Amino acid sequence: DSYSSIDSPTRHILKDLNGKSILVLKETNKSQFEAYDWTYPQIIKFSSTDGQVMLDGIVTYPPNYKKGNRYPVIVHGYGMPGTQIVYNRWGSTWNQYLAHQGYIVFSMDARGMSGRGESFKNLSYGDMAKYLSKDTAAGVRHLIDRGDADPDRIGAWGWSGGGYFTGLMLTKNADLFDVGVSVAPVMDFRLYDTIYTERSMGLPQDNKAGYDSTSVLSYVDRFKGKLLVMHGT
């Protein structure tokens, strides 16, 4: 058995068929992390803008965080249908690195993502951008309203689906996001592989409006920030 939480590193335990613990195979003393000012993430809940649902987010604060001070925020996103990014498990060392540079690191599960049942997951069918943009904006505004986030220093980053997420934030949500790093993105899902796309979007000829709404290219006229796009060869 293997398990962890946001405040406990992973433990690997050998159990018998009845579930009785026999031996701890591997564990990490969290004091080794605390020696480097490890900051434990917090899982938060906030309302969607339309008030229809409570959403889950996870926040990693800088080690020297002081309530009442506003900090730059890096939003790490993915957002593809059926995926999940907010977990009660041991956290990312990359997020820790960013937090130690003075950033608040924020991630959330928008409507259409996983972990909340089939009906929640299916809300993004046919338009992957609709709730991803709205719900992420609600999360960022929640951090602004509670006095944590500097509204003039909000950035996004992600890889693959997260690269798409970043492009969407810098365009459709350009009123909130200033900078972004988009790695290996899909900017228009008409140009991506059909076996992945069509199970969430339907056929392009049957859902032109949904593909248009999902495409980052539909919102490039709103772009006013700085975006670094990275990809392989």
Model-derived segments and their meaning:
Residues 1-233:
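Serine-hydrolase catalytic core recognition
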